[in-house]
Amino acid sequence: MDAIPAVRQPQIQLPITVQLPKIRVPAALSDPRLVQILSLGILLGAGVFVRDFSIRPAQIILTFLFALTTQALCWRLEPNKPRSLRSAIITSLSLSLLLRADNLLAHPIAAAAAISSKSLLRFRGKHLFNPATFGLIFALLVLPGSWVSPGQWGQDVAIAGWVVAFGMLVTNRVHRGDISWTFLFFYGGGLAMRVAYLGQRWAVWTHQLENGAILLFAFFMISDPMTGPNARRGRVAHAALVATIAYWWQFHLYAFNGLIWALFIAAPAVPLWDAIWPARKFEWTQNGGDHEIVHASKTAPCDCRDCSRDAVRAA
């Protein structure tokens, strides 16, 4: 009997690995402020066309015009600082989202005051107040016919979800999500205790936290890296302080605009937190990298995630 020839097994060839060239994103496009501008712009567009915000196109145009013009004038006071209009655009969008007035002058004047405060009200190299917050308080105190309308957002779950999503994109890029979530923890905890004390249904609590104004404040205002504490522990303490003042303002004084007033009143405490917990100051850089911390101080430690990873690798 003839022998059966052996069956030759086919050879399996592994796929060839092709290494694609790395695509470098231009430095200007990796700036987190562009993400914030896009997010606020989408929210403003949704508010105007979906929520029917009571703001006229002329008010928005004048807000941008006066903010950008004031920023250009302020550069004369600080000729050595890097020049960028992105922060002024963010302030203009924030004022357009929150400020309401029955005349055309309130918005541009508030915008000019907000941008001017960055150059005039400074302490140890940092501007003291969040520009949008200062502009809102200035309008409420000085400009008649002005008000802040937090109720315009309603309690729409979809809008709340988009605000949180956009906010997380921004805060993660600048490593400031800790202050946003800490504020929501303390403020939400105060609301929860009040609901329990009054014997209300927990649907009231979730209804309050779904307010777009609270989420916009948490992710786009208190998280401002230029006016917040430098150290993580300072940011946690500051968020707790702002949440406490906001709760006291709203539920003990029964006054309006507790969030805005709380951030304004607590602003002078930021230098105190920086003195207790020294850390390197945040600065916007021109390289547009994911790490936006300028190591200006050689003695103060930096507690951001990138520096922590570098320290572990060095050890």
Language-model-derived ranges and their functions:
Residues D2-W75:
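N-terminal signal-anchor module of multipass membrane proteins
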Residues P15-L38, G190-S297, C302-C304, A315:
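C-terminal transmembrane helix-loop-helix hairpin of multi-pass membrane proteins
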Residues L40-A46, A67-Q71, S87-S96, A110-S117, ...:
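Hydrophobic, membrane-inserted alpha-helices
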Residues D52-L65, L98-I109, S146-G161, V204-I214:
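Structural signature of hydrophobic alpha-helical transmembrane segments
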Residues L68-N80, A113-H127, A165-H175, F219-P229:
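C-terminal ends of transmembrane helices
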Residues N80-G154:
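Membrane-interface helix-loop-helix junctions at boundaries between adjacent transmembrane segments
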Residues A132-L136, S180-G189, R235-A243:
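Central hydrophobic cores of alpha-helical transmembrane segments
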Residues L143-Q200:
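Internal active-site segments that recognize and position negatively charged phosphoryl groups
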